[in-house]
Structures are given as C-alpha cells and as structure tokens.
C-alpha cells in the first residue's frame, strides 16, 4: 500500500524544480497524488476499511492545501502541475 522508495525517487526526479529538491509543493503534491491513487485502489476492494479511508481524507485535504498555496504563490506553476498530474482543477 505504501510507495516504494524507488517509485518515490522517480516521482521526485520527475517533478523537482532544482537538483536537491525533495520538498517543493510540486513534489509533495505529486507524491500525495500517487499515494491517494494507491489508497483509492485499496479502498475499492476493501470497502469497510474506515481507518484507511480516514487517512485518505487527510491526504486529500493536505493536497488541497498545498495546491491552494501554490495557486496563490505562482499560478503558472500551479497550472503546469495540475495539467501534468491530470487533476480536475
């Protein structure tokens, strides 16, 4: 259910803004999106797993806050990220 370190490194390399970037909003949103998608698949088969559902809702809220921050800070970076991830915003 959790991301492997290799997959996380792939995401970081794809979305990083500079060489040692691991914590920019783009990277954080991309990692959260991957975790959310994985958890969604888990919850499709395990409908009564309410503990994981709560974790999913917390991740979605955190991603929403990061996207709002990025939209307020730099709209072009926000739009590029949303297009690249295929989010509905």
Curated annotation (Swiss-Prot):
Keywords, sorted A to Z: Ribonucleoprotein, Ribosomal protein, RNA-binding, rRNA-binding
InterPro entries for the chain: Ribosomal_uS15, Ribosomal_uS15_bac-type, uS15_NS1_RNA-bd_sf
A Pfam family the protein falls into: Ribosomal_S15
Domain of life of the native organism: Bacteria
Gene Ontology terms for molecular function: rRNA binding; structural constituent of ribosome
Cellular component terms (Gene Ontology): cytosolic small ribosomal subunit
GO biological process: translation
Assembly and oligomerization: Part of the 30S ribosomal subunit. Forms a bridge to the 50S subunit in the 70S ribosome, contacting the 23S rRNA.
Family the entry assigns: Belongs to the universal ribosomal protein uS15 family.
Role description: One of the primary rRNA binding proteins, it binds directly to 16S rRNA where it helps nucleate assembly of the platform of the 30S subunit by binding and bridging several RNA helices of the 16S rRNA. Forms an intersubunit bridge (bridge B4) with the 23S rRNA of the 50S subunit in the ribosome.
Protein name: Small ribosomal subunit protein uS15
Record organism: Halalkalibacterium halodurans (strain ATCC BAA-125 / DSM 18197 / FERM 7344 / JCM 9153 / C-125)
Lineage: Bacteria, Bacillati, Bacillota, Bacilli, Bacillales
Gene that this polypeptide is encoded by: rpsO
């Amino acid at each position: 259910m959790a991301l492997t370190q290799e997959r996380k490194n792939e995401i970081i390399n794809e979305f990083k803004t500079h060489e040692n970037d691991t914590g920019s909003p783009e990277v954080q949103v991309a990692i959260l999106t991957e975790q959310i998608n994985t958890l969604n698949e888990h919850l499709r088969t395990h409908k009564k797993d309410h503990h994981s559902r709560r974790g999913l809702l917390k991740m979605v809220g955190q991603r929403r806050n990061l996207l709002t921050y990025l939209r307020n800070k730099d709209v072009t970076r926000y739009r590029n990220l949303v297009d690249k991830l295929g989010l509905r915003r």
